[in-house]
From Swiss-Prot:
Keywords: Carbohydrate metabolism, Isomerase, NADP. The active site is at Y140 (proton acceptor), K178 (proton acceptor). Homopentamer. NCBIfam families: heptose_epim, PRK11150.1. It comes from Salmonella dublin (strain CT_02021853). Binds 1 NADP(+) per subunit. This is ADP-L-glycero-D-manno-heptose-6-epimerase. Its cofactor is NADP(+). The keyword Flavoprotein does not apply. Belongs to the NAD(P)-dependent epimerase/dehydratase family. HldD subfamily. PANTHER family: ADP-L-GLYCERO-D-MANNO-HEPTOSE-6-EPIMERASE, NUCLEOSIDE-DIPHOSPHATE-SUGAR EPIMERASE. It catalyses: ADP-D-glycero-beta-D-manno-heptose = ADP-L-glycero-beta-D-manno-heptose. Pathway: Nucleotide-sugar biosynthesis; ADP-L-glycero-beta-D-manno-heptose biosynthesis; ADP-L-glycero-beta-D-manno-heptose from D-glycero-beta-D-manno-heptose 7-phosphate: step 4/4. HAMAP family: Heptose_epimerase.
């Protein structure tokens, strides 16, 4: 059995889909379905069982055996960069992850988990997986950073696989439940389908991020499980592309050309990553050599998926 925490969420459900595509269906999804809309991410997937994340944690902490576990993909977390309840964030993202990590270490179960490019904070170059480059801007980024630091202490002594992925700007199918945290491509598509003019912040040609397609993210996760490699790795494309490029690809799909530019909100000033670009040196040195989709390629595929029933 393979366990995917956050399996009804964005990246987790895409990992479940990638496993299904390989013929794997003996999957336990762990999540919190208080937001019941997330069920839509699972309706077309095949899983063996579902468990609430709190019930799962109780079983983990009691040391109860869950059966023959091949691996745990730990994608479950509060991923809101605008959430400032630090106690909630640390309980949910840090303590929970530690409990799960130790459960895996004691049983030599491969543990593959979601870290984040938010660990780098507001820097504009050298996104390298090393302490001197890390300075998160928000408590979400801090919770991810601190768990990475915890893993770094344990890695040299670990007898089983531990691998963390610093996800950059992931976009693609199954993110609709994320609301304001969904990608720009998702929001632009929604605006266009509602007959509204698509909106971008002023200066969006200057805001550049490493936008990585979720199908590529899932593929990297599965490759690492098969390879058995451990470590903490950036997971982006290695290319920074502008929000304008995302808009251009979305507009091209919809055969539209006009866009409305809106003022940049004060509440985001100083807390907003204006530039991200993954350094893929470590990922490539680990042996992952497949190409990543460009924004034009990924957004076009995503638009086809979003509008498949239109």
């Amino acid at each position: 059995m393979i366990i995917v925490t956050g399996g009804a969420g964005f990246i987790g459900s895409n990992i479940v889909k990638a496993l299904n595509d390989k013929g794997i269906t003996d999957i336990l999804v762990v999540d919190n379905l208080k937001d019941g809309t997330k069920f839509v991410n699972l309706v077309d997937l095949n899983i063996a069982d579902y468990m609430d994340k709190e019930d799962f944690l109780i079983q983990i902490m009691s040391g109860e055996e869950l059966g023959d576990i091949e691996a745990i993909f730990h994608e479950g977390a509060c991923s809101s960069t605008t959430e400032w309840d630090g106690k909630y964030m640390m309980d949910n993202n840090y303590q929970y992850s530690k409990e799960l990590l130790h459960y895996c270490l004691e049983r030599e179960i491969p543990f593959l988990y979601a870290s984040s490019a938010a660990t780098y904070g507001g820097r504009t170059s050298d996104f390298i997986e090393s302490r001197e480059y890390e300075k998160p801007l928000n408590v979400y980024g801090y919770s991810k950073f601190l768990f990475d630091e915890y893993v770094r202490q344990i890695l040299p002594e670990a007898n089983s696989q531990i691998v963390g992925f610093r996800y950059f700007n992931v976009y693609g199918p199954r993110e609709g439940h994320k609301g304001s945290m969904a990608s720009v491509a998702f929001h632009l598509n929604t605006q266009l389908n509602n007959g509204e003019s698509p909106k971008l912040f002023e200066g969006s040609e200057n805001f550049k991020r490493d936008f990585v397609y979720v199908g590529d993210v899932a593929a990297v996760n599965l490759w690492f499980l098969e390879s058995g490699k451990s470590g903490i790795f950036n997971l982006g494309t290695g290319r920074a592309e502008s929000f304008q490029a995302v808009a251009d690809a979305t507009l091209a799909y919809h055969k539209k050309s006009s866009i409305e530019y809106i003022p940049f909100p004060d509440k985001l000033k100083g807390r907003y990553q204006a530039f991200t670009q993954a350094d893929l040196t470590n990922l490539r040195n680990a042996g992952y050599d497949k190409p990543f989709k460009t924004v034009a390629e990924g957004v076009t595929e995503y638009m086809a998926w979003l509008n498949r029933d239109a």
